[in-house]
Amino acid sequence: MTDLVPLRRALLSVSDKTGLVPLGQALAARGVELLSTGGTAKALREAGLDVVDVSDVTGFPEMMDGRVKTLHPKVHGGLLALRDNAAHVSAMERHGIGAIDLLVVNLYPFEATVAAGADYAACIENIDIGGPAMIRAAAKNHSFVTVLTDVEDYEALLGELEAREGATGYPFRQKMALNAYARTAAYDAAVSGWMTDALAEVAPRRRAVAGTLAQTLRYGENPHQGAAFYVDGSDRPGVATAVQHQGKELSYNNINDTDAAFELVAEFAPEDGPACAIIKHANPCGVARGATLAEAYTKAFQCDQTSAFGGIIALNRPLDGPTAEAISGIFTEVVIAPGADETARAVFAAKKNLRLLTTEGLPDPKAPALTVRQVSGGYLVQDKDNGNIGWDDLKVVTKRAPSEAEIADLLFAWKVAKHVKSNAIVYVKDGATVGVGAGQMSRVDSARIAARKSADMAEALGLETPLIQGSVVASDAFFPFPDGLLTAAEAGATAVIQPGGSMRDVEVIAAADAAGLAMVFTGMRHFRH
């Protein structure tokens, strides 16, 4: 192995031809011989460059509809041969194999083909075979071969050649080899993931998780932790696909909280009215519907004004001027919405630190997806919690049935509870949260905390009666004892929604009847950890 390897011969075979011609011209200007295949060779020739077809090197034409182009010893031998190994050099001479110093390959657009909704056969045809084989060969032999798999690396190569007078150094080749192996790993992960979905495999024997670096973050949850943001290439609207119009770079916590906020607000379809969710530390501190977006924000903000400071705001409709004006009254880290009109953007222009993201759509809360969580020595995979219920799914278990207004609020509270860390208790009144208890080890403590925060907020707003009076309450899991339910009743709740299923359901139902509560069971739990 030597540090500097002059580039004399390069093989270029790319699907994405962005930057191809300038790269070819720069290499040719340095006297590098260009080998190529199919459309890549055609593009280079049309630019006036001399190109040797790989089929002329191998003595075999491209065949089987292009499935076989580069799978030949004269290609792979040129990539894999150790230049300081006498036996390898002798074999190259005997078989007329020329060394290849540079490989430039990007792969068939398999991921884009799948994303476009192509049928099974079309996806199969877009699985690259020769490309990954060459990439892996060149990467393995990075002691002597430079391999490029990303258009973004072309300029880096030209800079390296300029700095090293037409050669590449070992550190550069090693870095490009790492990029190459990461690319083939991600490509294979995409193929295996697609086939897993196509075969409806719930738990395949092996599962690969891959992503592309979107942003190197200043730090993680805390300043002493390194962090980065990777995207998986899916087109689900959200923080990964959003356009940032202003403000500082997103932090690790911003990204995590913004995702939580947007997924929550997407539970409320825009055609059913404007909705707003305010998130702090991945938990909602206010969620509401309103006649206007500004009203929805104001109602959500009134749930817990203290916690909303420095929070994340998500909207289910494009941000407008009046809503932007209302939001501007408090320090906010991020606002995410399907869009933002010019008036709203002009209002926010004065808030230099506020990050405004738009997504051109909402994520589908019913779309199948997976959630992945790392544990020591492995990771957990599960279906995304897309569980939802309607009026017809509710089972009235108390003597008093809830009114239509109570049912509307119960269903609203149930949607919110799904997005609150367990144990979750959510009080709702008139389409707005009025108390949220999250993340407590005891369900009754969550009920008490939510009630106390509502009372504190009423005092801060100068209200004689806490908003929690006449509210409904949702619990993400069953009440194991009557105490949590009775705490809610004492706070002013009139109706309850919960999964049911406790050994003490009969006792809890009796307590609800004694307190004059209406209660419905959903038969569905929404634990969130």
Swiss-Prot record:
GO MF assignments: IMP cyclohydrolase activity; phosphoribosylaminoimidazolecarboxamide formyltransferase activity
EC number in record: 2.1.2.3, 3.5.4.10
Record's keyword terms, sorted: Hydrolase, Multifunctional enzyme, Purine biosynthesis, Transferase
Entry annotated with the keyword Transferase: yes
Keyword Lipid biosynthesis assigned: no
Reaction catalysis annotation: (6R)-10-formyltetrahydrofolate + 5-amino-1-(5-phospho-beta-D-ribosyl)imidazole-4-carboxamide = 5-formamido-1-(5-phospho-D-ribosyl)imidazole-4-carboxamide + (6S)-5,6,7,8-tetrahydrofolate; IMP + H2O = 5-formamido-1-(5-phospho-D-ribosyl)imidazole-4-carboxamide
Pathway the protein acts in: Purine metabolism; IMP biosynthesis via de novo pathway; 5-formamido-1-(5-phospho-D-ribosyl)imidazole-4-carboxamide from 5-amino-1-(5-phospho-D-ribosyl)imidazole-4-carboxamide (10-formyl THF route): step 1/1; Purine metabolism; IMP biosynthesis via de novo pathway; IMP from 5-formamido-1-(5-phospho-D-ribosyl)imidazole-4-carboxamide: step 1/1
Xref: InterPro entries: AICAR_Tfase_dup_dom_sf, Cytidine_deaminase-like, MGS-like_dom, MGS-like_dom_sf, PurH-like
One Gene Ontology biological process: 'de novo' IMP biosynthetic process
GO CC terms in record: cytosol
Domain MGS-like: residue ranges: 2-149
SMART domains xrefs: AICARFT_IMPCHas (SM00798), MGS (SM00851)
Entry comment, domain topic: The IMP cyclohydrolase activity resides in the N-terminal region.
Family the entry assigns: Belongs to the PurH family.
HAMAP family the UniProt entry points to: PurH
Protein name per its UniProtKB record: Bifunctional purine biosynthesis protein PurH
Organism expressing this protein natively: Dinoroseobacter shibae (strain DSM 16493 / NCIMB 14021 / DFL 12)
